[in-house]
Amino acid sequence: METFSIKEHFDKITEKTNLIDKFVEEYLEVLNNKTNDYNFYKRHGKRFYKITQIVVGRDGKNTDQLSVHSFVDMNTGLVYKAAGWNAPAKGARFDLLDEASRKRCFANADSYGGYLYR
């Protein structure tokens, strides 16, 4: 049986967390580049990043119309459709740590969330 030190274990967790953070930033960039009608941001929760969208007005400034687009699990990188403001729907739609799933997510992503339906 292989043994790991606490530092090695912590380093692996940190590496995975940094990778998930990087992919979430790429996800936001993809969403923001696909529309001028919304601006997308992430909010930190206890377990999930909440991906929110704000409607952009005709003057190009953010309005006060805010909604949840999706959730990303901070520990696993799984992407979920929003069931409401505070909770994701059951069943992950994409896995940001899996290259094929991530590419499919980014290719199909849109501001309306249609790609998140099963």
Please provide the spans of the model-predicted regions.
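Cysteine/selenocysteine-centered motifs that mediate thiol-based redox chemistry or coordinate metal-sulfur cofactors
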Residues: 108-118
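A short, surface-exposed interaction/processing loop segment used at functional sites
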Residues: 78-107
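Exposed beta-strand-loop-beta-strand "reactive/processing" segments of non-cytosolic proteins
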Residues: 36-70
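Short, non-transmembrane alpha-helical segments in secretory-pathway proteins
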Residues: 2-35
